[in-house]
Each structure stands twice: as structure tokens, then as C-alpha cells.
Amino acid sequence: MLTPLQIYFPIGVVLLVAVVLAFTMLGLANVLGPRRPSLVKQTPFECGSEPIGSARERFGVKFYVVALLFIVFDIEAIFLYPWAVLLLPDGQGYPGLGWPGFISMGIFVFTLVAGLVYVWKKGVLDWAD
């Protein structure tokens, strides 16, 4: 029987090699890399074309709101996936889930749909402005 130290030793070796390799690459890049700044190196890259305007522009708050909504509904999908896997057909799923699991997930989905309707009615997703 293997001890926990014997089981996790290869993982520790791989982790140590990865850390040493990463710091070695960073050190070599710092030592061997050029240190002469120029205007071309400090210009932001925009798909090969000349940049228009400043790189320090403000973005509209709508981008952040949409990003937060994406995260909320992405987390909803993360919570829905295990529940759906537990409800496999043909008796392969978890038998103890039953109606309480279905009702609790229904409440969860209803709450998120109500939030989406609220956000939609408030005009957060309207980009016409």
C-alpha cells in the first residue's frame, strides 16, 4: 500500500520542475532581453494598423454590466449541470433527489429568470443609447 507521500511525490516533482523552469525563463528573458526603449515598442498594437486615439479611454459601464450578467448566468449553468446529471433517465441517476430537488432547482431557475426579466425591463441590455 502506498503512503500519501509516495502518491503525491510525482505531483510535487512536476510542480517543482514547473516553478524552476518558469523562473529560469523569466530570469533569462530579463538578462538576455534588449533594454532599449523606443517609440515603436511603446505603441499599442492594434492588428497591424496604426492606433487611433489613446489607449487610456474610458469604457461604458454597460460592458461591465454585461460581463457581470454573463458571470451570473455562467454560474447558473455550473449549478444546473450536476443537477441535470443526477437526473439521468432509465433509473441511472441519484434516486434520492426526487421532487424536492426538482422544486429547489425550479425555484433557483425561476429566481434567475425573474432577475433577467427585471434587467431586461430596466433597459440594461438595450444598446440603442
UniProtKB/Swiss-Prot annotation:
Annotated S-S bridges: none
GO function terms (MF aspect): NADH dehydrogenase (ubiquinone) activity; NADH:ubiquinone reductase (non-electrogenic) activity; quinone binding
Main location: membrane
Family from the record: Belongs to the complex I subunit 3 family.
Zinc-finger recorded as keyword: no
GO cellular component term of the entry, any: NADH dehydrogenase complex
The protein, known as: NADH-quinone oxidoreductase subunit A
TM annotation in the entry: 9-29, 68-88, 97-117
Taxonomic lineage from the root: Bacteria, Pseudomonadati, Myxococcota, Myxococcia, Myxococcales
Purpose: NDH-1 shuttles electrons from NADH, via FMN and iron-sulfur (Fe-S) centers, to quinones in the respiratory chain. The immediate electron acceptor for the enzyme in this species is believed to be ubiquinone. Couples the redox reaction to proton translocation (for every two electrons transferred, four hydrogen ions are translocated across the cytoplasmic membrane), and thus conserves the redox energy in a proton gradient.
Alphabetized Pfam families for the sequence: Oxidored_q4
